Amino acid sequence: MSDTSIKQQSQLTSGDFTAAENPFELFAEWLAEADRSEPNDPNAMALATVDSDGLPDVRMVLMKGYDADGFVFYSHIASQKGRELTANPKAALLFHWKSLRRQVRIRGTVTPVSDAEADAYFATRPKQAQIGAWASKQSQPLESRFAFEQAIAKVAARYLIGEVPRPPGWSGWRITPSRVEFWHDRPFRLHDRIEFNRDTPAQPWTKTRLYP
């Protein structure tokens, strides 16, 4: 590794964010570190949506991919988050890596992934998880755990042999960010914060330091 590369890596990992030219570069570095240090699910993120009354809802989901177009997760379309994203396709995300004392906040617009993308990801899931996606009516009232187990057994019998197709009501979303903020803990609450902004995906990012 060259001296320049070592210096840039040090800047990215030390909280000196001047080396980062776009948020995806810095996010990739932080996620790689979280993958090494977090005991569970470094790709876990809080997803915030709003209902028809403007009241917020937030829950933890797993990021299943990201690139320059945004951050991807999957769920049932008829779930509470799915209904809220259909009615108001805007959302916020929060990654918090306690072991690194860092967090990343993201806001942006939401679009469904393509059927081909959803099919490809669903095919990678364990078969029991695929069966669960068919058996669950996510966010709907459930009579009992036994009723759910019966539904799982029924689906498992149907797909005892062969591949399990993706349920028509199960898919994914991509959050295309317009704002990404990185926060790094410092002693005495003198934290580091840097914010990236853009109005549209076609525009370049602007970078601003923020007071803690």
Curated annotation (Swiss-Prot):
Binding residues for FMN: R59, M60, V61, L62, M63, K64, Y74, S75, K81, Q103, Q138, S139, W183, R193
Catalytic activity: pyridoxamine 5'-phosphate + O2 + H2O = pyridoxal 5'-phosphate + H2O2 + NH4(+); pyridoxine 5'-phosphate + O2 = pyridoxal 5'-phosphate + H2O2
Pathway stated in the Swiss-Prot or TrEMBL entry: Cofactor metabolism; pyridoxal 5'-phosphate salvage; pyridoxal 5'-phosphate from pyridoxamine 5'-phosphate: step 1/1; Cofactor metabolism; pyridoxal 5'-phosphate salvage; pyridoxal 5'-phosphate from pyridoxine 5'-phosphate: step 1/1
Enzyme class: oxidoreductase
Cofactor detail note: Binds 1 FMN per subunit.
Keywords: Flavoprotein, FMN, Oxidoreductase, Pyridoxine biosynthesis
Biological processes, Gene Ontology terms: pyridoxine biosynthetic process
SUPFAM superfamilies noted in UniProt: FMN-binding split barrel
Entry binding sites for substrate: K64, Y121, R125, R189, L190, H191
UniProt-recorded Gene Ontology molecular function terms: FMN binding; pyridoxamine phosphate oxidase activity
Cofactor(s), by name: FMN
Alphabetical list of PANTHER family matching this protein: PYRIDOXINE-5'-PHOSPHATE OXIDASE, PYRIDOXINE-5-PHOSPHATE OXIDASE
Family indicated by similarity: Belongs to the pyridoxamine 5'-phosphate oxidase family.
Function: Catalyzes the oxidation of either pyridoxine 5'-phosphate (PNP) or pyridoxamine 5'-phosphate (PMP) into pyridoxal 5'-phosphate (PLP).
Official protein name in the record: Pyridoxine/pyridoxamine 5'-phosphate oxidase
